[in-house]
Amino acid sequence: MIIENSILTEEQIKGINEKYSHLKDTDVIESLGCYEMDSEQNNLVITEFPINKEDLIEISNQISNIQQEFERLKVMYKMFISDVFDFLKLNSELEKKNKGTNELDVNRFMMHLLSSGKLFVDFAENQIKTKHRQKFKKFHKLTSQQYDNSFAYRFCYNLRNFSQHVGIPISALHKKQDYVDDEKAIISLWIEKDYLLNSSFNWKKLRNEIEARNDIDAVELVKSYMEAITILYGEYNKFLLNIHHCNLINLKLSLENFGLVHKKYCIVERTKYNLKYNPANITTRPLLGLADIDAIYVHLSEIGIVKLVNKE
């Protein structure tokens, strides 16, 4: 609903003609729109711009650019998590007594999550390299630290290359009756170390680690890999916040000084003719503002990066 009269009086139409005498009826007039809730209905209130329109658009664009960096990172992370859950769900399905084993599906899901994990890291690093080149070396250290600290991360990094060029990642799938629960079977998905070490793949420094270990439980490996990627996701978000926090605070102060509030805004476009005779005939373009800045910090609070304080 638009809070404006659908039919204007002759006096109102005369006022529009006088105000926009320099415009033709086909010219577009832009106004500021604000969405407000009233009795559970979202209304669009249309007003004049409180400041220079171009200044408001510039602020919106800056918020949008920052928001997209966080959002793209979140999308890539969710893709990885989705692949992990698909793999774990398949493993649970295989535990059903009458469910047949399928080595093809197991390896397909495993290869998906190995690829999406690497894709997540590659995307994050490329985004920083493109937008914040001077900070890339510091950012890359986050990935290097995780590689050094987590066997699951560095092993899966190499296992992904192995599965692309040499062979399937999971070499053994065992299923036996669960004598505690007659309706379930016990599933074991193994990455056998002899299978890896006897292949043509160059494991480099990782070879000694593999030799020192028993065969690797694929399910436990995936869970540890997910933890490692989740740690990286948090560290990447911290890094982005350190880059953008001061600018976000300044943008927030500017919007508050302009008298804008924590609501959704847009640019409303109408021809001069429609403004006079059909004011509800509009097109809108979103303007990012305080609510969108808040949304960035809300997500960061959800993943434990910041703590929000209610000032009320």
Question: Language-model segments: which ranges?
Answer:
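Inter-helical turn/loop segments and adjacent helix faces that build the functional surface
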Residues: 127-139
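Acidic, Ser/Thr/Gly/Pro-rich intrinsically disordered interaction regions
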Residues: 2-107, 138-312
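Short, hydrophobic, well-ordered secondary-structure elements
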Residues: 105-128, 157, 161-164
